[in-house]
Every structure is written in C-alpha cells, then in structure tokens.
Regions:
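Phosphodiester-processing cores and adjacent nucleic acid-binding clamps
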Residues: 1-168
C-alpha cells in the first residue's frame, strides 16, 4: 500500500484538474506533442475515465518516487542524463497505459519474497529485464543499460499484451 505520509488520492484530486490530466495523459513524456482532442478522449475513455485516471496518476507519482530512489541507489546521484531519460520515458509509458499499480504490486511481492519470506527469486528473465524502472525497483537484478536491452520489447503503447514479469 502507498503510505499515508506520501499523501492521498483525495489530496491529488484537489491539486490536479481534469484538464491537467488530459494534457498529461495525451502528451509525450516531455509534455509535448499532445494528441488531437478526439484521439485524446479515446485514451481517457480506454483508461476508464477521470475517476480511474486520478487513481492511476496517484499510483504513478508513488511509482516515480520509488523508481528515482532506486535509480539513485543503483546509478548514483546526480543521475546520469541517459538514466534519467530512460526512467522518465518508461514511467510515462507505464502511466499512460494504466500500469503503475501493477508495477507497485510486483515490486512489493518481490521485495517481500526476497526480504521477508526467504523465497528465491530469479534475477530477471524475459523482456522485463529491459526495463530500467524494474531494475530500479528491485524487480530485476539486471542492468538493462549495461547490456543494451530494449524496454520496448517489454512494454510499448502499440503492444496489446499486458506486461508479464517472469519471477522464476
């Protein structure tokens, strides 16, 4: 669960308007290249409307917090520019596809398996090993930048399959 010290979804709703969400969810990771209104509305509808998008945004903010904390641990601070760009891009794709909650859940159960239950979890296999965010969250133990692995093989807006993270 997202700790209360991080804030609440209700607090986010008071700070962020539907217009803000529309722009954020229909633009690229740099806030540029916004989709035309009709196409943008299709994105909003596909994600379940604004009630659902507020939840996605809240989860995305916490995921971003955890990912950047992990990035600093793995790559040092200040982050190298290429790492920051990869993390920012991946987080945007995860958010606009509606998957931040999935990554929070997987991160939580991998951490619990390793640290609390003594369950052996593999270092990462399959296309999820191409995610810098998964590496920063501790889901995988393989640095995709070191091995030039592609995030887009794992998750991209043109791929209709749900993300699949192999944990064995």
């Amino acid at each position: 669960p997202i700790p209360e010290s991080f804030g609440t979804e209700e607090q986010l709703r008071q700070k962020v308007s539907e217009e803000d969400l529309f722009k954020e969810f229909t633009s690229d990771e740099n806030g540029q290249n916004q989709l035309p209104p009709e196409e943008g509305q299709k994105v909003i509808d596909r994600l379940g409307g604004y009630d659902k998008i507020y939840r996605i945004k809240f989860e995305a903010e916490y995921l971003k917090h955890l990912a950047y904390e992990g990035a600093k641990e793995r790559y040092g601070a200040p982050l190298p520019e290429n790492v920051d760009e990869h993390v920012n891009f991946e987080l945007h794709v995860m958010k606009t596809m509606g998957f931040p909650g999935y990554f929070l859940i997987v991160s939580d159960f991998i951490r619990a398996a390793r640290e609390e239950l003594g369950v052996v979890v593999g270092p990462g296999r399959g296309s999820a090993a191409g995610s810098v965010v998964a590496y920063c969250l501790g889901i995988t133990k393989i640095d995709p930048l070191k091995y030039d692995l592609l995030f887009e093989r794992f998750l991209n807006p043109d791929r209709v399959n749900l993300p699949d993270i192999d944990t064995d």
